[in-house]
Amino acid sequence: MGEQNKLYYDVEKLVNSLQESFDLDCAQSVSLFTSKSRSNEAWLEELENKFKLKDDVELDDVENLRAEIDMKLNMLEDKVSYYERLYKELEEFQNEIKIKTVVNNRRQSRTPI
């Protein structure tokens, strides 16, 4: 029985040692986590003071303004496209008039007056 008691005592001692080591590791982890959490909270507070967030009304106003600008930009793009097409048509018309003028001048120069 003496050897069994010693074995039981050694196992109990080993379990206690492991428990102490585990408890120490847990305490260190909790301490590190707490320290980092506090550091992150301080950093977050610093960022909040440095960069003020816009409230929902201001964000909605910005979004509405962006939508309005997009709409105006689309209208301008449509107008530019229209004027580009008009320019091409006028250019074609001008070329046709030049050709007709040349043809008409040749025709008039051939007929005796």
Curated annotation (Swiss-Prot):
This is Biogenesis of lysosome-related organelles complex 1 subunit BLI1. Residues 57-97 form a coiled coil. The lineage of its organism: Eukaryota, Fungi, Dikarya, Ascomycota, Saccharomycotina. GO terms for cellular component: endosome. It is found in: Endosome. The gene is BLI1. Component of the biogenesis of lysosome-related organelles complex-1 (BLOC-1) involved in endosomal cargo sorting. It comes from Saccharomyces cerevisiae (strain JAY291) (Baker's yeast). Pfam families: BLI1. Belongs to the BLI1 family. Component of the biogenesis of lysosome-related organelles complex-1 (BLOC-1) composed of at least BLI1, BLS1, CNL1, KXD1, SNN1 and VAB2. Keywords: Coiled coil, Endosome, Transport.
